[in-house]
């Protein structure tokens, strides 16, 4: 269990550090800190894994300590050392995120939500301290250590998966956010109602068109711009439609009584 725990804690912190590097790579001092913490964490994970593999000499004594003579590492001392270092690394990783959080150009409410998640990551470090204190209670040491390991690993996974929560969970205290499904699929089904066919085979757009000049994202636009009211994002689209009402020479494969409409919509 402890060998798996060391690997899990190492890769969880690697994922968080990789996210930090991707977000704040322009800050050289911060990037150096990320690399330093990553190297220390990697050395910690490898060392703990090797120590648990070669915990006793000979190795058979790990599985049958009452049958094989040999020596083993003091488990309590080892536990206190690697849990203390792991807690310090938890606090450092959470502190790095909170340090750079004010530089993000996001809403204040979102900043508070992210800060709460990072504080939850720091709580993983406090769990490590609790494990050290209770490790010397030999009566329930093994049972409680397993429980605290599971709790600590679960909290770590919750924190490292934080970037995807916005797309799969509703906003806390706010209206529900769109589903993870593509908004363009929903928008296209709504925009399809904008095309109405007439008896002579021509097509008309019932959506509002921007005639003249307007602005979209700070740039001036003109022409047949339409507002994508059905979408979950503010955007304008240029619509270029052609109708083929009586030209039967080009579209001989269209059955009688039906009409073929071609549309090209470019979203910017």
From Swiss-Prot:
Major localization listed first in the record, in broad terms: membrane
Any one cellular-component term (Gene Ontology): membrane
Intracellular or extracellular location(s): Membrane
Topology in the lipid bilayer: Multi-pass membrane protein
This protein's pathway: Mycotoxin biosynthesis
Function comment: Part of the satratoxin SC1 cluster involved in the biosynthesis of satratoxins, trichothecene mycotoxins that are associated with human food poisonings. Satratoxins are suggested to be made by products of multiple gene clusters (SC1, SC2 and SC3) that encode 21 proteins in all, including polyketide synthases, acetyltransferases, and other enzymes expected to modify the trichothecene skeleton. SC1 encodes 10 proteins, SAT1 to SAT10.
Additional information: Trichothecenes are sesquiterpenoid toxins that act by inhibiting protein biosynthesis.
Protein name (record): Satratoxin biosynthesis SC1 cluster protein 4
The encoding gene: SAT4
